[in-house]
Amino acid sequence: MHFPSKEQIAALQRQYPRGTRVELLGMDDPQAPPMGTRGEVMGVDDAGQLLVRWETGSSLSLIPGVDSFRIVQKGGRS
């Protein structure tokens, strides 16, 4: 598994700051929330995955470049 550099992680943190609201458009995972489910980005982990708290109660992470999602509202909390 390839882990992103510190610079790449920092770029993801700027692109998806804590509090950013996202909407799931598609995810190839049997545990995925339904398409259209919205959630809040809680942070970015060391693997470059977005830690998301979904409105369904799930906390499944998003993988930028693999999962399909859109930003609904940009966050700004640190």
Predicted regions span which residues?
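Basic/aromatic-rich interaction segments and small domains that mediate binding to polyanionic partners
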Residues: 2-77
